[in-house]
Amino acid sequence: PDQIAILRNHSRLLKTRAKDFLMLGRMLHPLKLDEPTLAIAAPLDKHSKGKGEVPTPAILTSSWQSSDGRIGHLFVNISETKQPLNVRLDTRNTPARGTYDVELYESKDRSSFQPLWQGVPLPKEFARELAPMEVVFLELREAR
């Protein structure tokens, strides 16, 4: 994977309020994705000079809770091709609260967070095609 592109996309993300989750928040159990895997070359062990292939999901994910209780889900397409993302969003292992407003950050747009849904109950299906090296972050907060 193009590591510079991935780092650049993460750096942009950390300039948004996603830092409340990724730097100051608490990691939650990640969402389960049913996505293709890649074979990534990696050292077999610390003493070996040989490399083996490690099966790795094409889309990496992590889930977070900010100090004020918002939930965030991060998705990163580490492949060099477009990948479909199909996921059932929930609040992970935190207590569910009525309905949620959901905002979306996409690195390919270099934008700030944009409203996605308002006042939706969870769990809810989310589907999107991720461009190569794209970073997507979803923020879930209790509906106002």
Question: Predicted segments — roles?
Answer:
Residues 117-144:
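C-terminal beta-strand-rich structural cap/linker in extracellular carbohydrate-active enzymes
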Residues 102-123:
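Solvent-exposed beta-strand/loop surfaces of large extracellular or lumenal domains
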